[in-house]
């Protein structure tokens, strides 16, 4: 692991080598906006903004991308809910349960699945207010997601409205699926078969499929 310093909390960002090409720009962009972000109480706390940068990218095939953290109790790991109470991760788990037949589980975490990096486009929000920090993170969000897409084969974005123009923001030719958000109304996410489709796309690209059942916690 490497680390860099920034002028505001969290003061130190620890990161895996695979993120090195974007770190100097990240530091510059963060120092420009941090004082604005940090006027608010945030979800997650600043020490957890950049926790996913500890993840390597060279072994990732799929990025599952949400829009921003839970407005309360964000852990810095997208979709993670240690007490398994958040609607989004419960819906994701039930979708994978239907796909795999696994039923006796106590939780689900995308971050423990080989080949997958869960990501949030915006890395924080004001406590209790989704998308409230979008304007501050925008340059950083674009920089980091572009870097991720240089490594993965499939980018799966959760949120049809939020991601309607995502392809315009990406430079790498990555296969992109834009699906319903797990919290979408009318149970639209239930009918979404993106997790299955991702594995078909990986096979077409001669890559190993994702074992989605690995995310279950018992």
UniProtKB/Swiss-Prot annotation:
GO terms for biological process: DNA repair. The active site is at residue 68. Plays an essential role in viral replication as a component of the DNA polymerase processivity factor. Excises uracil residues from the DNA which can arise as a result of misincorporation of dUMP residues by DNA polymerase or due to deamination of cytosine. Homodimer. Interacts with protein OPG148. Component of the Uracil-DNA glycosylase(UDG)-OPG148-polymerase complex; OPG148 and UDG form a heterodimeric processivity factor that associates with OPG71 to form the processive polymerase holoenzyme. The gene is OPG116. GO terms for molecular function: DNA binding; uracil DNA N-glycosylase activity. Keywords: DNA damage, DNA repair, DNA-binding, Hydrolase. It catalyses: Hydrolyzes single-stranded DNA or mismatched double-stranded DNA and polynucleotides, releasing free uracil. It comes from Vaccinia virus (strain Western Reserve). The keyword Glycoprotein does not apply. PROSITE patterns: U_DNA_GLYCOSYLASE. It comes from the Viruses. This is Uracil-DNA glycosylase. The keyword Hydrolase applies. Its EC number is 3.2.2.27. Belongs to the uracil-DNA glycosylase (UDG) superfamily. UNG family. Gene3D superfamilies: Uracil-DNA glycosylase-like domain.
């Amino acid at each position: 692991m490497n680390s860099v310093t920034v002028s505001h909390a969290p003061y130190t960002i620890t990161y895996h080598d695979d993120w090195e090409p974007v770190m100097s720009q990240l530091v510059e962009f963060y120092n420009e906006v941090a004082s604005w972000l940090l006027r608010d109480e945030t979800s997650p706390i600043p020490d957890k903004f950049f926790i996913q940068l500890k993840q390597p990218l060279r072994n990732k095939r799929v990025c599952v991308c949400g829009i921003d953290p839970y407005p309360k109790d964000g852990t810095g790991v997208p979709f993670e809910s240690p007490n398994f109470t958040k609607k989004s991760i419960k819906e994701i788990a039930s979708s994978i349960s239907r796909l795999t037949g696994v039923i006796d589980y106590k939780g689900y975490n995308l971050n423990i699945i080989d080949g997958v990096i869960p990501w949030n486009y915006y890395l924080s929000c004001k406590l209790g207010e989704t998308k409230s920090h979008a304007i501050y993170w925008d340059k950083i969000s674009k920089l980091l997601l572009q870097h991720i897409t240089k490594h993965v084969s499939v980018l799966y974005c959760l949120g049809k409205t939020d991601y309607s123009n995502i392809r315009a923001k990406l430079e790498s030719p990555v296969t992109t699926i834009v699906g319903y958000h797990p919290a979408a109304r009318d149970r639209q996410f239930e009918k979404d078969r993106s997790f299955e489709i991702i594995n078909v796309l990986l096979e077409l690209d001669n890559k190993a499929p994702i074992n989605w059942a690995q995310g279950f916690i018992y």
